[in-house]
Every structure is written in structure tokens, then in C-alpha cells.
Amino acid sequence: MSKKTIANLTSADLSGKRVLVRADFNVPLDGDGKITDDTRIRAALPTIQDLTSKGAKVILASHFGRPKGQVNESMRLTPVAARLSELLGQAVTKCDDCIGDEVAAKVGALQNGQVALLENVRFHSGEEANDPEFARQLASVADLYVNDAFGTAHRAHASTEGVTHHLSPSVAGYLIEKELKYLQAAIEGPQRPLAAIVGGSKVSSKIGVIETLLDKVDKLLIGGGMIFTFYKARGLAVGKSLVEEDKLDLARTLEAKAKEKGVALLLPSDVVVADNFAADANAQTVSINNIPDGWMGLDIGPNSVKEFQAALSDCKTVIWNGPMGVFEFDKFAAGTDAVAHSLAAITETGADTIIGGGDSVAAVEKVGVAEKMSHISTGGGASLELLEGKVLPGIAALDEA
């Protein structure tokens, strides 16, 4: 899907125009209401600065947390407005609501190149319900629309889909443009060999993506808690490891499908097991054929790491979604760390590496190699759905290029 982007709009299109920008400012705060990681705010700057430099009046909208349609004082966007003011080097006008007379007055007072931030759109139940009247009110203070919130693009909400019925043009910002470029290219026309590494605890949450990837990839590497469902399906003893009993047939089907399509499906040959689920548990490395009763697998083992590294060494494109083990516990982080370092190394030799949202992003940041990847997706659910080939409502609603 080729969409019109902010790059298609000139100063003549934008000067003096009121532009509603849907951003994703859902950043983590500490107990004192201080922002602990401003990555998402910084990620929106190229779009905001492009608009202000072309003389637009920028109206920023975002959700924050899950206030469930009620005003929640701890979920106001005030800290975001303060951080944005610092990063942009100009005062950002903060509104106390996202619709109504106060918003209209503050937006009306903006000069060309100035920025206003609306209050948390989820303080109104009409946002997540995609209520047409709420969408109309939200859009009423603007002339055109830019969506730069990839993380919510898989939801049809008022600020991601509803407003596009009232504002034209409706285009993608630079963040969404980059997401589409990397994620779609990886699926539609990748440099080969193409490998996908899928981790995480449950097969059930990744079924769609694994099935789609089996039609596209040359190699599929599986780690994380979901491996034990595959082992049990093969008839192996898995101790107290996590197993989805109702997905054993599915695991067999996926293995058969990989074989039929000529996809190299790699499961770990050894695992690090623990006597309980804790950071200080006793741990040992065992072959997958020798998992002891009463123990649970919490990471892939050193032999598996070597096998995975060998499989990735000649790949030209790699998509990674989901950790190899319980990387939050240092004792069970080695597999995830090793995969992160391997991807950083092959990126240096020209491979495209795409970190597909969620826990894998936290993992590469923890290891300190985030900067070395080709692309880090800002959307967890959205990137998975795009990789599954689903249509994202927030993207579909934008103007065609």
C-alpha cells in the first residue's frame, strides 16, 4: 500500500495551515511523573520540525496509558509538553482538553510555525469507540491530517481513522513512512536469504505471523517459551516448562508446513533450565532430549546460540520478533543477548535487520546494540499485524500516493 506522505506536501501546501498530527507520546513515567525514556517523543521530531519549517500551525494529539474514557490526572500530557518544548526549542501550547472552546481558542492564537499539544485523547470514550461526533470535533480545529503513530495504526480509533473523513489531505508522517518501507520491503521484496526469528512465550500469540512467514522466509528460527509446545508435540518430556496443550496439533502442522515449503525451521538443540521461575533459581544446561522432571526451560542453550549464529551468518534480511528466553533475569538472558549481538554484526556487513516491536526492542536496548540495527519498529501489535499481511485501519484511511 503506497500512501501519500508528508514529503509530498510543500511550503505552499502547508504555510498558515492547521495540521492535526496524531503522534504516539505514550512514554514511561516514574513515580514523580518524570519521563524515563523520551524515545517516542524524539521519534516524532522530524515530522513536527518539517511542518513548522514549512510554516504550518501544528496541533499534536496522542493517547497516554489506559484512562478508559475518564479524566485521570496522572495521565495528563503535561510532562510531554514540557519535554517537547525543550526538544523543539520553542514553547509548546498545552491544552487542557482535546476538543471544545478552549482548544479552538488556543489553536486560533497559534502563529505559523508554532505548536500546540492537545490533552490525552483517551480521556473521552469516543476515541476508542471511533465515535463520529467526537472525530468531527477533534478534526474541526484543523485543515489537514498527518498520522505518525504507527503503534496505534492497527486500531480504528477517532484520532487514527475517524478524523480522516473530515480532513484532506490525510497523509503519513516520516515515522510511519519508515515503518512501511522496512516492514513491507522485508515481506514483499526482501534481499535473500530472508530469516525470521520468532520468540516469546506463547505460540498462540504468534500463529498468524509464523504462518505468513512460512510463505515468505528461507529460514525460521524459533526461541522463547513457545519451543516447549513444539517439543511436547514431538513427544519429548519438557518438565515444568510452559506448554500450550491445546496447540500441540498446530505445532505439528507448522513443522510439516515448513518441510513442505522447503523452509529451514530451527528449534534450539539445548536449553537452560531452572528449578523455579526466579532470578536466583538454580540453573543447568541440558539437551532438549534430557529436560529433567520438575525443571523449566527459561533460555536457549550455548549450542543453540552457535547453530542460530551459523544460520544467520549468510542472511541478507532478518526480522526479529520476541526474546529467546526470560531476558529480564540476567541468568537467562544469554540467548537473547547473543542473538542481538549477532544481528548487530551482520548489519555491519550489509544485512537489513528489522526489530519488530515489543520485547525484542527492550532486549536490543538492554544489550546496547539498538543503534546498530537497520530498523527498530515502534509498534508491537501493529508491526506483527503488518507482517501477517493484515490491513491496518490507521494506514488504510490515509490518501493513496
UniProtKB/Swiss-Prot annotation:
Binding site for substrate: D24, F25, N26, R40, H63, F64, G65, R66, R122, R155
GO biological-process terms attached to the record: gluconeogenesis; glycolytic process
Binding site for ATP: K206, G297, E328, G357, G358, D359, S360
Catalytic reactions on record: (2R)-3-phosphoglycerate + ATP = (2R)-3-phospho-glyceroyl phosphate + ADP
Short name of any one Pfam family annotated for the protein: PGK
One GO CC term, this protein: cytosol
Record-stated family: Belongs to the phosphoglycerate kinase family.
Protein name: Phosphoglycerate kinase
Organism of origin: Acaryochloris marina (strain MBIC 11017)
